[in-house]
């Protein structure tokens, strides 16, 4: 206790000032408390800073993660099962379609529907000309009088005619099933002089075989002649290709020929032409008689480019050149090693007999499907329709590879999902690849012939969908395809859509089913549905407009200074006039109508499959509501349906003024560009353009048969000062400000007047529909239907006879074909117009 009291006393004494006896403890403690307060505040700030820093780090990491997540979504596959099995194109499942003319970009060639195919093809040269013109890939610059399939059934055989100025080549192929690898096939190439040729031409045919990343090729050479190629690959097993001797057409006796061959490394298939060209040498002698010796051009040796990438995998290219004077024929045989029960060789009379049987079957099937003879078409027009159809189905290709894609989250383009694509193409010379909005039109015709092919094509396209529901609108899958495309068009952007025309084909499939769903069809539609749903949802989330039930195409050109009217490539109608100043306030009537069709088809599919359909039914009812459609898109001034946006009617292209500093002279390279001049500021209004876009509520049969707006459309269609011509409906009214106006200094009018067959098909189809619907305009529609159908058939056939081709578009003032050719993509819909099958 004493120690405790002493301790307390000492504590009390320590709190008393020795001089004045006052308690000074508070004065001594104040600084300590302030320090503690400051220390506490500092700790709070430090803690808060640490928390903020941690939150910032977490947010930064989350932002990076999310950006990376969004960046990778463009190349993330759709989670549903593929529509087509990975081996759906294999010889085990579809042996009859394993081999085919799946190389539309070359005049003649075959490959398999596989990832790494052995590739075969044909080149030719007319000898003793001032220039060496090597023909291989389909080129408009070759200026051939005509070329194309006359008959092709998509599976078994094809007959093609290629006209040069002095001779005609006929290329025929046929297949014979057997074994486990797709069986055998035979080519027959026939050369005949043109009647106008001054003498029978000497022609070199160059047959080639190339491996494309897989397989072994072994040449068999006798003297200077490559007589055969044997080989093997994982998908073909063992095989042999034999080059037979050229024969006289009449006697069938062997003809004199000179031979050359080439064996060369080939890094990629797009290099084949260049390799052959660089190997040509004019030192070889053609001497059918000792008195007539002439030097001709033949393949010799090929020296690869020095310092090529050592890591490059080189494939093998083998070329067999035979030089003969026309007329003659020559056969090439492919024989599968697994075809063990071959009773005879598939050549000569055996091949001829089988070819004739296929031709008769083709004629009979074509007549049974399209009934053109029954409709009164003469034989020459029936042959025309057969050729048009054959070029569509014979122009189908099989591609494998990756597109290059980019989203707003990717700084650089990325390789897209690797995969195959079995598809028709718009043009063998200019567009030898798949286009999304073209394909729906292509399959309207092909499905009439073979629904199995069309179902597979649709499956291939939808299997290219990513997790977002986006499908690249242009499929440029390999180096061979990329070699045909300008660099600025190679990269596909995932905010950009394309008209979902595959719904047109699916609509036709549902109509053909007529409510009778087979087990096979049900399985197919069930596989389609998850991807169709995602695709449909993608449009409704990425392409919506500023108002409910409105839509807007993304991807319009942003450099408004150089374009008279910024293009809308994504709509498929490229330079068709839209709002002059692109903005988020735009409403596009054509896209709204496409989504009306899509909603209807989705409703019908869900009904067939017994799935919930109310959402699609509600959307269809909203989009097909004529009063709401008119509220959003009817222009009282134009008396037509129209786009809406930030638009000026006073624009033109003018030479820009180049200011030259005082004391300096203008340089020669300072050419004044054509730039856009806006004389009146834009405002939100309807776009003053009457043309194809204005017709979409009619084209897709959304208008009620008794709608007064239908009468307006029919009257304006028939007006020669607007859309009507003796050759078909022009794309833009003559009264529209941008009719036949260039869009830039270098871009001629494209969808600003010329006649397009795909939209005219939709017009004829709609007229046929309204001519069968009870209403005040039924008779008017029937009259226009007959007149327009006749005009289209007459002009397109006339141009085919005169030029040898179907064309991308037709001049609205003369009817002449123009643009790329041959264009047997959607221009082939003329066959359905002839057959009145809509």
Give the label of every model feature segment:
Residues 567-585, 650-723, 750-784, 817-838:
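Aromatic (Trp/Tyr) and acidic
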Residues 376-380, 394, 399-444:
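Asp/Glu-centered strand-loop micro-motifs enriched in Gly/Pro and often flanked by an aromatic residue
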Residues 192-194, 588-628, 702-704, 741-774:
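Long, repeat-rich segments with strong aromatic
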Residues 429-563, 569, 592, 596, ...:
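Aromatic-rich carbohydrate-recognition surfaces in CAZymes
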Residues 418-428, 472-495, 559-587, 656-658, ...:
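Acidic/His metal-coordination segments adjacent to aromatic residues that form catalytic metal sites
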Residues 2-386, 430, 604, 769-773:
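Terminal accessory carbohydrate-recognition/targeting modules of carbohydrate-active enzymes
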